[in-house]
């Protein structure tokens, strides 16, 4: 039996969170979502996902700063962070702070599924 993949999505867009949750649950994933990166290390530590999807624009701190925090934490730094944004110019910056990959918004379902398969 295949292990259930645990996926954490940080995005302030409610529609995107709902759509990703539906898609990933159909894939058999366990999902946690957050519209804020406040206390991100605590949020992630409590859920311990297999992969994190991180939006660039969050209401409290940027996805860049949130990714830096995660990658600086020895317990959490091995969790793949997939950065997503409508701003394609941020891809190199995201990767320079530790993001493992980048998805350009809007993305199709297969791109989301491929990231799960690639990193989990």
Language model features: what each stretch is:
Residues 35-36, 62-68:
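Acidic catalytic/metal-coordinating carboxylates
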Residues 65, 87-104, 111-114:
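Alpha4 helix (beta4-alpha4-beta5 surface) of REC/receiver domains from two-component response regulators
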Residues 14-32:
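Two-component/phosphorelay signaling modules centered on CheY-like receiver
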Residues 17, 59, 77:
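The feature encodes the CheY-like receiver
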Residues 82-84:
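Hydrophobic/aromatic residues positioned on beta-strands within the core alpha/beta folds
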Residues 1-6, 110-120:
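Non-catalytic signal-transmission and effector/linker regions of two-component phosphorelay proteins
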Residues 33-51:
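Acidic, metal-coordinating helix/loop segments flanking the phosphotransfer/catalytic sites
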Residues 55:
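Active-site residues of response regulator receiver
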């Amino acid at each position: 039996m295949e292990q259930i993949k645990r996926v954490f999505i940080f995005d302030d867009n409610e529609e995107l969170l709902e759509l990703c949750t539906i898609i990933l649950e159909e894939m058999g994933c366990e999902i946690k979502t957050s519209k804020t990166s406040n206390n991100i290390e605590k949020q992630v530590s409590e859920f311990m996902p297999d992969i994190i999807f991180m939006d660039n624009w969050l209401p409290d701190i940027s996805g860049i700063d949130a990714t830096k925090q995660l990658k600086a934490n020895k317990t959490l730094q091995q969790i793949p962070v997939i950065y997503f944004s409508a701003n394609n110019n941020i891809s190199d910056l995201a990767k320079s702070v530790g993001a493992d990959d980048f998805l350009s918004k809007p993305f199709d379902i297969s791109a989301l599924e491929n990231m799960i398969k690639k990193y989990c």
